[in-house]
Amino acid sequence: MAGLSSSQIPDGEFTAVVYRLIRDSRYSEAVQLLSAELQRSSRSRAGLSLLAYCYYRLQEFELAAECYEQLSQMHPELEQYRLYQAQALYKACLYPEATRVAFLLDNPAYQTRVLRLQAAIKYSEGDLPGARSLVEQLLSGEGVEDSGGESDYDGQINLGCLLYKEGHYEAACSKFLAALQASGYQPDLSYNLALAYYSSRQYAPALKHIADIIERGIRQHPELGVGMTTEGIDVRSVGNTIVLHQTALVEAFNLKAAIEYQLRNYEAAQEALTDMPPRAEEELDPVTLHNQALMNMDAKPTEGFEKLQFLLQQNPFPPETFGNLLLLYCKYEYFDLAADVLAENAHLTYKFLTPYLYDFLDAMITCQTAPEEAFIKLDGLAGMLTEQLRKLTIQVQDSRHSRDDESAKKAVNEYDETLEKYIPVLMAQAKIYWNFENYPMVEKIFRKSVEFCNDHDVWKLNVAHVLFMQENKYKEAIGFYEPIVKKNYDNILSVSAIVLANLCVSYIMTSQNEEAEELMRKIEKEEEQLSYGDPDKKIYHLCIVNLVIGTLYCAKGNYDFGISRVIKSLEPYHKKLGTDTWYYAKRCFLSLLENMSKHTIMLRDSVIQECVQFLEHCELYGRNIPAVIEQPLEEERMHTGKNTVTYESRKLRALIYEIIGWNV
């Protein structure tokens, strides 16, 4: 019946056809027929009413509201149309308009429904005291004349939502749990409970309820294609249907992704997003779009920025969007863009940024032009946070001493949250001196924070890096790198390649060659096992370790051994040559060429021949490999022909020929 027009429908069958389409949830086709019919008879009450219903089911709430507005003007005596108009406006997030229409309703028969709607509007607008007042009025039955008073079940849910918004997550859990036990399984209620558990950092019970939602959704609605995209199966969009909304699958997968992201299981987080029922990009809800942008930022930063910028223009958008966009601008050092967004959206600053986040962003933006001033701002922020950490430490100790487990748990959670705020401030301070290569000062900043951060992995990793960079503290660097590596020894490829490389170099520089060799054998073994399952997968860990070791020997002037190590590390080229590995290799070659041009070193002909052959291989295998990864928002893009390993390897080969006087 796709594309059916009014003229094709036999006389007297139009209404039956429309109702059949609605029965089969083919609302778009029903809209086409009804719209065409209303062009001929624009004041048809039945036609407008059905059209409004179809728009509502298609989640085209503004269009539904327009239809209901026409109906209420045509039939002012039928107040249900005004109520439906207010509900559609609320669903379209047009809260002032919905409030205005709701206030026009004075029929006692609709009083409870109007109060519920007004409470929902105030809740969505962030007016929690106003929402609570209306919810309590409904629960008490005060001033409610119609018979449809608020049930205890609805009341528990509404109070749970208010408690959640007020930050009382455990109390919200109790309300949702009571409602769930009273009603039996409800997908949206299970999601509310999972969200409250997540916000109180109780990830295990949150994941349990999420798994329940997903399992039931798959069993009851196999047509929604859960997991198909992850498995690489090409499937068509399931659309934003009412059935999809009722299953709460989209919400559950987004929450699962958020939990995995918090637990730093980034692959699992991305998989949660691809597991959700397939939809076209234009059909995605704001939360999914936001999470996709965030979790694919490393691989697709340009797309990520575009999605976040797009969301910022929508009403509403996820409240985290504004802060995350600004933080990512700072991460990629687009400080001017961050400053512009802050200046252009002052009204959002007070609504979506906490004082801490605003002060942090202000300091980060200041770093670009006035690093000394930025350091002072960050120092003030750090001082405030360390004071909070000390107070919370005392609270934890006092609670444990008095055996008040609940207070101790609350204080520990607050301590962890405050520490997560302190670490970025500390790292931003350290980066100011790192950029000036003042490594002793960076070390001093880290040592001042040892009281709070000595168990934090990010802190330990950065302490290791700054000790390593000072070149006379390799032994101390080992003390920080080793625990990180040993913690993940059974899954060593999950450790950053540069951490493994720096640890190997530190072993070599402290004459612990056996430890370095053992670590490299372990990496090689894991890479071999991984390549059995996926022979074409590029794995760079051992390659980067060898490149860094080769770089070390080149830096010490032993180019014969260093360059040979670099060359061997990139074999086989089809698996080892990449943007990152080329970066390390070309640095060594540029250093070699500089010293050759100054006549400070002499290389054997066999080594020069080896270099030329290496660059020829890089030219052959590097045609489709970018020489550098461009910044995502760069206005002037590099010439595509020049931004390849092939182009740069030719340039290096030409320089070799020029320096040694070979004719080509």
Swiss-Prot record:
The gene is Ift70b. Interacts with the IFT B complex components IFT27, IFT46, IFT74, IFT52, IFT57, IFT80, IFT81 and IFT88. Interacts with KIF17. GO terms for biological process: cilium assembly; intraciliary anterograde transport; intraciliary transport. Keywords: Cell projection, Cilium, Cilium biogenesis/degradation, Coiled coil, Repeat, TPR repeat. This is Intraflagellar transport protein 70B. Its main location: other. SUPFAM superfamilies: TPR-like (SSF48452). InterPro entries: TPR-like_helical_dom_sf, TPR_rpt, TT30. Belongs to the TTC30/dfy-1/fleer family.
